[in-house]
């Protein structure tokens, strides 16, 4: 398995955390230097997601987070990789993670590597809807289909066709159709046209900050992105109101799809309920 950990080159503490977390289990990995607000970021947006550059209320750090994933996908496509596992540098790994991440036979036995799919490894401890699927369990973990919003990009496996799908569509999206990258990947805001997202259950990983919150403890690593979002939230709220007025003029065609999706989720919830994806 090609395991890529998105991390700032200067984040010594987090990189030490990753080296210990992955290294102690014999899991191979490589760092991918995260983007930050810079000329390099502007160039990457211009090449891959031009609408993101003009987005009025996503912060520079949020744009950099978005583009770190997008640039990594583009790199994987250039290298001809059939799939990659992507992590962020505050990730915690669960029991037996090496059996999933040190080799990939289990993945190729269960998924068509030439199709578009995502295997979500992470939980955010939110109540979500998952629907049982025919994919066989592996090492006491199941692979139900994720049928509701489940944010976060601390750990996932994405196939070549899924990377191509997102990059092709991101390239032509206007600013008003773009949100944070986790919302594009794991909510119904963005129409993935039937591309399946499988939720590993119990989850194989979680973000350290959210696990600490779940346990009512203090975070040891914190979240730079969460801090940035909090600092800019009030200012961006006023910008968002003006931006949403503009977006409303062109959204009527999409509202029908959203209503249908909400109705579908309501029907699924009646059958399957909502539950927290545990981490172990």
Curated annotation (Swiss-Prot):
It comes from the Bacteria. Pfam families: Glyco_transf_25 (PF01755). CDD domains: Glyco_transf_25. It is an enzyme of class 2 (transferase). Its EC number is 2.-.-.-. Keywords: Glycosyltransferase, Lipopolysaccharide biosynthesis, Transferase. GO terms for molecular function: glycosyltransferase activity. Pathway: Glycan metabolism; lacto-N-neotetraose biosynthesis; Bacterial outer membrane biogenesis; lipooligosaccharide biosynthesis. One of its GO terms (biological process) is lipopolysaccharide biosynthetic process. Adds the first galactose to the lacto-N-tetraose chain in lipooligosaccharide (LOS). Belongs to the glycosyltransferase 25 family. This is Lacto-N-neotetraose biosynthesis glycosyltransferase LgtE. The lineage of its organism: Bacteria, Pseudomonadati, Pseudomonadota, Betaproteobacteria, Neisseriales.
């Amino acid at each position: 398995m090609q395991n890529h950990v998105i991390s700032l080159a200067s984040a010594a503490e987090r990189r030490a955390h990753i080296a210990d977390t992955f290294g102690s289990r014999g899991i191979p990995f490589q760092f991918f230097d995260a983007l930050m607000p810079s000329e390099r970021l502007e160039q990457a947006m211009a090449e891959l997601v031009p609408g993101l550059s003009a987005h009025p209320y996503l912060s520079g750090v949020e744009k950099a987070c978005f583009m770190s994933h997008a640039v990594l996908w583009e790199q994987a496509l250039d290298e001809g990789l059939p799939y990659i596992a992507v992590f962020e540098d505050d990730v915690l790994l669960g029991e037996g993670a090496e059996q999933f991440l040190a080799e990939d036979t289990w993945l190729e036995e269960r998924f068509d590597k030439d199709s578009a799919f995502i295997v979500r490894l992470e939980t955010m401890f939110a109540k979500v809807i998952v629907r049982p699927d025919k994919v066989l369990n592996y090492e006491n973990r199941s692979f139900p289909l994720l049928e509701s919003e489940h944010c976060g990009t601390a750990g996932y496996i994405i196939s070549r066709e899924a990377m191509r799908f997102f990059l092709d569509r991101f390239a032509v999206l206007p600013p008003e159709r773009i949100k944070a990258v986790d919302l594009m990947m794991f909510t119904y805001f963005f129409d993935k046209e039937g591309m399946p997202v499988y939720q590993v259950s119990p989850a194989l990983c979680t973000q350290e900050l959210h696990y600490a919150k779940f346990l009512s403890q203090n975070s040891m690593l914190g979240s730079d992105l969460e801090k940035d979002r909090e600092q800019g939230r009030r200012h961006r709220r006023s910008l968002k109101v003006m931006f949403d007025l503009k977006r409303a003029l062109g959204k009527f065609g999409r509202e029908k799809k959203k209503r249908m999706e909400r109705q579908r989720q309501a029907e699924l919830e009646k059958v399957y309920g909502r539950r927290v994806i545990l981490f172990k």
